[in-house]
Amino acid sequence: YNNLGNTFTQLKKFEEAEVNYNKAIELKPDHAEIYNNLGVALDNALKIDKSIDYFKKAIQINPKYINAFYNLGNAYLYLEKYDEAIKKYSQILELNPNHTRAQQNIIDILNFHTVDNKNTNSIIVANNNLKKIKSNFTFNHSSKITDLSNFFENSNKIIQRHNKDLTTINTQIYRLNSIDLGCDRHFRVFNKFKLIPKFCFSCFKIQIEPTSVLELFKLFFIFDELKLPKNNIRKCFVELRPDIPGTYKGLIYCSSTGEANEIIKIITPIINKLTDSRIKIKRGCSEFSKLFPEFEEINKDKINFMKYKNEWEEKEKIIDATKIKNFKVRDTLGGLSISDVLIMNNWLNYAKEINDLTYKNIDKKIFKSTFISEKLSNQLDIRKKNFLDLIKKTKINL
């Protein structure tokens, strides 16, 4: 019955799964795995409160059942009970200090949720200490590179003091608002049907291309301090998508070209003061333009300006008919977080791999990221070329 329940769960037939798990429980009422599996089925069916009872029962039977702790933490996370979620992830780390998913979930929560200073989890202690560091680097005056270097060095020391082996596979630093753009949903539509969702036709981005990792760090601080009328979503990242050219990028999300142009007026003096980055407006995601080149056109008065095809709407409805567990988006807390520092270390590894020597201006003793090395292994030559091309275009002698 347990195996049959697992099969129905994989087929997304959650009611049938629940029936079979309950039959299994009747036969083996002290079997922790069955309770956990039933909780997973209920969780996927969005019966979150009910799933929590079964995860707790599984833990009651087996107090060292890590999967049940993890699933319970995720259920609390979905319900926005962040302190409860962190408590469960922390209990996992007491059982297995190297459980990377529990570590990452705590790190992610700390991007938008403040935890009591009394919490003794080493990740939280490090994050709270990072919040106390004051940076001399700001876009309001002429800052020195040494200010940036000292700031990062002090931040890294805090993490190493509390979590020597802590890493992340994330490479993008976001400054989010509470508006969910639905990007995961839109890519499900695109990947399944090879069409561009209607929402994305009104999505425009200001793309900023820093010329080095040093410039990317500067852009991060600009984005962190930037005050915009609508607190637009923004992010800094290194390019790792195999078919998308470029190296270092920053994006500000806008709902129209008009809004993008207004924001460009605000940010251009700041960007030009601290960096040599190129600024442009682009439409939607780069993956869309690979399949539909005309989607790149941002001038609606041009003949080749692409418009949404109404027949695509029925395909979108197919995706929307599928119940998906969507976590609520919340405003990112200002200031440096442990997530930011770990991602910055990945940026420095990326820079070292592509021969961008400006990483030495920030920190010569970077911590090796096997994740970055593996991600770049099949695209290292093209990234090195992208970097050299960027230098030539901006006429910068690094």
Please state what every model-predicted region is:
Residues 212-213, 254-261:
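Helix N-cap motif at beta-to-alpha junctions
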Residues 78-80, 96-218, 235-237, 298-398:
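Charge-rich, low-complexity segments
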Residues 219-223, 263-272:
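Short amphipathic alpha-helices in soluble, non-transmembrane regions
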Residues 2-10, 21, 33-44, 67-77, ...:
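Conserved alpha-helical positions within TPR/SEL1-like repeat arrays
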